[in-house]
């Protein structure tokens, strides 16, 4: 298996710089965006951040946009693989752990935090073996497999919802500051007149079931006093527009909403999936919701997420099945006619909010990192990053190499690379 690490960006630094915090996250926005939120807080405090992700995954496109150095491993998930690939998984994982160890020796992080994703497993195991302080943040109520494993030897286990782990610290999921700063629900919603404003969120990829169920439910209601704003994803935009047109429902269909704070402030009610980040935003904004969990989500984690809001009377949960349009019609009929119920749900959501989650996570990371030495060495590194670094494993010799410019240094196959006197690797 080839193992690669791409340093997407590196700055010229002084001879002695504060060692970074390393973030392990990738695969989906649900893992990446919380990591980016925490990275923003750390960098605002003068703490450098580096990232470890999976080769070719979403994080390789998103993280460099934020000017954060990223290394990647050639690793993928194990769920749903055939028997032959599963039998070879231990070898691939150990190679990935070895490559992750190389990255850690190169970056010399003062602390490592996993938000989940394919690369987080090897990265977390390497951090443990090298003695770097390891923390875990689990966004969902049903923990992912990687964070389940890493939680067993992490120094601190942080969660977005209570009840995910024994001994957890429920700090919440990070949300954008502009969403957390919205006025209280009563200030926005009390006495509001005109059509009821329904915001539909399908996520970055869109949600076909919502594209079909919302127009069908609204036309069955025959409710003219409804204003719909539907975020559907670029790929499903034409489909969503056609569904509303066929139903005779006037809706603003958008592939992407740039200003989510303004969208939440506009809405009287939200219809959406139940991803952890979306629910954190609903609570921070203080808005009631109708939640339709993604039926194929791993371990049905979206239903577990939704149940937390339902238990607080902040949301209504509808299962995704053939009866969804009828049940959605019934729920909307009740909620559209009851502004007091909508306000009550919004207030309940706001009581669940943890708007300072990113700050709290950053505080805990730095508590564990300390201001001095840790298992990875001194608190400062004299490493001089190259403009571009590539790591790969030679398939024939199973050796790990580092290419920096025109120079090539080969490392014999061993558990971890040899550390140079300057803090790099050779």
Swiss-Prot record:
Binding sites annotated in the UniProt record for UDP-N-acetyl-alpha-D-glucosamine: 28-30, 140, 176, 204, 257, 302
On the tree of life, the source organism's domain of life is Bacteria
Q: Which GO terms describe its biological process?
A: carbohydrate metabolic process; cell division; cell wall organization; lipid glycosylation; peptidoglycan biosynthetic process; regulation of cell shape
Keywords, A to Z? Cell cycle, Cell division, Cell inner membrane, Cell membrane, Cell shape, Cell wall biogenesis/degradation, Glycosyltransferase, Membrane, Peptidoglycan synthesis, Transferase
Q: How does it sit in the membrane?
A: Peripheral membrane protein
List, alphabetically, the Gene3D superfamilies matched.
Answer: Glycogen Phosphorylase B
Cell location: Cell inner membrane
Q: Which Pfam families match?
A: Glyco_tran_28_C, Glyco_transf_28
EC? 2.4.1.227
Region annotation Disordered: where it falls in the sequence: 369-388
Pathway assignment reads: Cell wall biogenesis; peptidoglycan biosynthesis
Catalysed transformations (reactions): di-trans,octa-cis-undecaprenyl diphospho-N-acetyl-alpha-D-muramoyl-L-alanyl-D-glutamyl-meso-2,6-diaminopimeloyl-D-alanyl-D-alanine + UDP-N-acetyl-alpha-D-glucosamine = di-trans,octa-cis-undecaprenyl diphospho-[N-acetyl-alpha-D-glucosaminyl-(1->4)]-N-acetyl-alpha-D-muramoyl-L-alanyl-D-glutamyl-meso-2,6-diaminopimeloyl-D-alanyl-D-alanine + UDP + H(+)
UniProt-recorded Gene Ontology molecular function terms: UDP-N-acetyl-D-glucosamine:N-acetylmuramoyl-L-alanyl-D-glutamyl-meso-2,6-diaminopimelyl-D-alanyl-D-alanine-diphosphoundecaprenol 4-beta-N-acetylglucosaminlytransferase activity; undecaprenyldiphospho-muramoylpentapeptide beta-N-acetylglucosaminyltransferase activity
Any GO CC annotation of this UniProt entry: plasma membrane
Query: What is known about what this protein does?
Result: Cell wall formation. Catalyzes the transfer of a GlcNAc subunit on undecaprenyl-pyrophosphoryl-MurNAc-pentapeptide (lipid intermediate I) to form undecaprenyl-pyrophosphoryl-MurNAc-(pentapeptide)GlcNAc (lipid intermediate II).
Family membership noted in the UniProt record? Belongs to the glycosyltransferase 28 family. MurG subfamily.
**What PANTHER family has UniProt attached to this entry?**
GLYCOSYLTRANSFERASE (PTHR21015:SF22), UDP-N-ACETYLGLUCOSAMINE--N-ACETYLMURAMYL-(PENTAPEPTIDE) PYROPHOSPHORYL-UNDECAPRENOL N-ACETYLGLUCOSAMINE TRANSFERASE 1 (PTHR21015)
Protein name from the UniProt record: UDP-N-acetylglucosamine--N-acetylmuramyl-(pentapeptide) pyrophosphoryl-undecaprenol N-acetylglucosamine transferase
